Amino acid sequence: MRVVPYGETALYVDLEIDDAGARRERTLAVARALAARLPDADVVVGAGTIAVVGVSGWDDLEATVRDAMRAPPLGQGSRLHEVRVVYDGADLAEVAGAAGLSTSEVIALHAGTTYDVELVGFLPGFAYLAGLDERLVLGRRAAPRPRVPAGSVGIAGPYTGIYPQSSPGGWHLIGRALGVVAFDAERDPPALFQPGDRVRFVPSHVD
């Protein structure tokens, strides 16, 4: 583990764990332990990293982090979201070709996994969902789109995700989520998906 100052009122924690599954579980457990110990701070989860913002007193903070590292695993208390998806994305056929699969096989693989929300970033409410079948792991598009519609379901690298707002984007689009408001500034918390939640996609059709 590496703990370093991150400006005058923040610190950065790198758990330095290589295994993706173990890294994800440990990061969330430590982040929740830190949030409980530092209720006035903002604890921001990354991929195996944690930023703690709005704190001071380096020596005490380092001791607090090392104490939080002993936090037990989270267990099975996370929320499960089931998201209906119409698999008609603009890149579905291209993804299938790159993976050497049929479009039906791509859909079955994507919908056959329960994903973990590893972190939220890029856009407000954009959840990086870990657990993508390795056969669907692709680099980002060579040319990002200037506009990706809100609700689009994409894949890039080891992640899948739902675009919460219309924005530029370079992920491969394979479908669109139905009835999901991934971010609402009037909601508490504004982001629907939180680190530690789980997400399952359900293939659907529009009547």
Question: Regions from the language model: what does each represent?
Answer:
Residues 1-207:
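Glycine-rich active-site loops that engage anionic ligands at enzyme catalytic sites
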